Amino acid sequence: MKKPCLILALLFALFSTGFSAGTKEKPNIIFILTDNHGAWTLGCYGNPDIQTPNLDRMADEGMQFMKSLSTNPVCSPTRATYLTGLMPSQHGVHSFVPQHTMMGDEAYYMLEEFETLPEILHDEGYVCGLSGKWHLGANMKPHDGFSYWATMPRGGTSSLYNDPVILDGKLIDKSPKYMTDLWTERGIDFIEQNKDGDKPFFLFLSYNGPYCLSRLLLRPAKNRWAGYYADKHLPSFPRDTAHPWQYSNLDYHNNIVSIRRVAAEVSGVDDGVGEILATLERHGLDENTVVVFTGDQGWMGGQNGFFGMGDHTKPMAAHDMMMHVPLIYHHPGSIPSGKSDAVVTNCDFLPSVLEYVGLESRIPEKPKLTGKSYAPILRGEEVEWPIDMYYEMESCRSVRNERWKYVERRSPEGPGELYDLEIDPMERVNLFNQKGYEKIQKEMAEKLYAFFDKYADPEYDIWNGGRSKARRHHAPADHPDYREPKPRPWKAAVEKGKIYEK
């Protein structure tokens, strides 16, 4: 972590003494969450090709976490973790939730039994609003203290245009506009409704973009940035040969149409962030509002031959870039400008936000959280930080520290992985079961077992016969979570070589 100077630390210690429990004195909170979004796609994380001026400004003025990792590579589990602080083997959502749990007679909310961030904030006097993707079940009605509810009846999108949406309690067959703009406008509407209220507000602005998946990647972008990227080569997307484990998304790999579409959607999200920041400044709310920007999970765009997330490979993958998400906090006058190298995860988000706004007494005690509050970092303080980070995707689990990364898979077994991140940060040389590494391999495996033995709920511990609230991707044929694999429409697209560019 970059150490702030002593004078800066003393100033923030003097003026940033925390927030009162009185409702009016607590800051507003805007939590902006993007969908399938690798940190490497943003200018402030080093991308030279994709235009993200608003997020770059937000990072320059606020606290940017350089090593923020997701504990799972799929939408529903990671969103459940952000809202509860729990690992998938604790909250039970191991994969994306199926359509019948979101709409219809069988719909149910996946986190009903847990205390969630919006529920706690509502209890403490916040007005809570959702604008955007939900993907945690029972989408038609608000949950956990939300009084404003603009969302969609499903989890994904096939185009970011003309998708069905739920607005003002009604299901609308086709959205009236580009989804990124729609969620921005609804978010601004919520801010406008509550800007002069006597209670603080919490806005969960949950974009579908950049998404980086589905057949939309075979169609050129249509948003404001389409023309800008139409002739760009975008070399920040490596043109590596597809990895042998790449199970899906082969028709997008090295496809210049797909690459340009991703870039345009990232810039489209940046536009939305800019409008939110401008709205706060226009109403004089910027110094009383903490804005958090992050992604649900990381995404790879050709690095090491992977295109997508960890559930798009067979076996399931646990590459760092599938976990690495942007994380930026912006609160002028309260959060100092800087960068942190602390390895933080989405398990740390809930306790950090609650402590930052003075509600540390409301951090849930049961189930026991695996995360730790990084609120002291937001205040410019130097803190000791854990170096071990844990990840799970159904039968695949991993543990990493500053130097080593260990990956183990069960049901089906293997292959195992061990990497020396100090000399091999891109995880290209697998040292698993190699001579000379027996001791560190054993130590890392024991750490992994001890962590899940301590925290996993037996009901949801997949390694030990537990179940998933969502249907499994890869389950043994005799397991109740098993589902037949869908046919993969790669071949026709791959044969159309004219849309590819090296």
Predicted regions and their residues:
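Active-site segment of extracytoplasmic enzymes that catalyze sulfate/phosphate-ester chemistry
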Residues: 21, 31-34, 38-129, 148, ...
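Long, internal low-complexity/basic segments
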Residues: 21-27, 34, 39, 64, ...
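Beta-strand elements within well-structured catalytic alpha/beta cores of enzymes
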Residues: 26-38, 57-58, 82-84, 121, ...
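Short, solvent-exposed turn/loop segments enriched in Gly/Ser/Thr/Pro and often Arg
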Residues: 44-49, 64-87, 94, 99, ...
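Substrate-binding rim/cap in mid-to-C-terminal beta-strand-loop elements of soluble/periplasmic
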Residues: 83, 155-172, 246-253, 274-278, ...
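Formylglycine-dependent
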Residues: 93-123, 135-263
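Histidine-centered active-site microenvironments of extracellular/periplasmic hydrolases
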Residues: 142-152, 213-222, 278-335, 345
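C-terminal, low-complexity/hydrophilic appendages and adjacent surface loops
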Residues: 319-325, 389-433, 439, 468-502
